[in-house]
């Protein structure tokens, strides 16, 4: 009996910094990051090419910094540096799982991580390495969601997988409304008209214009990433 082939060959996984905290109030929870890497390792060993964009909200949020009197651009650069720290932690955990990870930063910190160069990133993916994109887009005023959309389009990912703590997009907040139901799929226009806030407006527009589908799923749900990659009904698909 033949094993089913993955539905996706190349994916862009967007992880929030907050997802790395686990139940902690701040920073990186080692057990959480190890568990996430186990999920990533499973799909990588199925032959899926995986690129990751990581946020920095567990260490520093540029938006929050800007709101308390700090210059917004400075705060955003600090947020970008936070994503580099997260990317290094993620790559370290991947190395310990037997994966080969490469961190590529949108801002130059050559002694620590290599700069983002698109052909090099594509080469790494073809070689079966996991590429972790750090420092967002390298520009202030752009979120790591936008970086995920941008890098996803650049590397020719088949889908952007937005990993959250909820298993999809709901009609209302499932924690507050017991009648809330999960959308299995939505068009970009439907998601916009319902103001569901799946990604920020810039990221969402980029995905829509490039016809790059988004799937929202729970990273805390064991096996969810594999089910998404296999094309099963997991999370919520947003498509053109």
From Swiss-Prot:
GO molecular function: ATP binding; UMP kinase activity
EC number(s) given by UniProt: 2.7.4.22
Catalyzed reactions per annotation: UMP + ATP = UDP + ADP
Root EC class: transferase
Binding residues for UMP: 56, 76, 137-144
Nucleotide-binding keyword on record: yes
Subcellular location: Cytoplasm
GO cellular component, one term: cytosol
Pathway annotation from the record: Pyrimidine metabolism; CTP biosynthesis via de novo pathway; UDP from UMP (UMPK route): step 1/1
Description of how activity is regulated: Inhibited by UTP.
Alphabetical UniProt keywords: ATP-binding, Cytoplasm, Kinase, Nucleotide-binding, Pyrimidine biosynthesis, Transferase
Biological process according to GO: 'de novo' CTP biosynthetic process; UDP biosynthetic process
Binding site for ATP: 14-17, 57, 61, 164, 170, 173
InterPro entries named in the record: AceGlu_kinase-like_sf, Asp/Glu/Uridylate_kinase, Uridylate_kinase, Uridylate_kinase_bac
Known partners and oligomeric status: Homohexamer.
Role played: Catalyzes the reversible phosphorylation of UMP to UDP.
Family as reported in the entry's similarity comment: Belongs to the UMP kinase family.
UniProt name for this protein: Uridylate kinase
Lineage: Bacteria, Pseudomonadati, Pseudomonadota, Betaproteobacteria, Burkholderiales
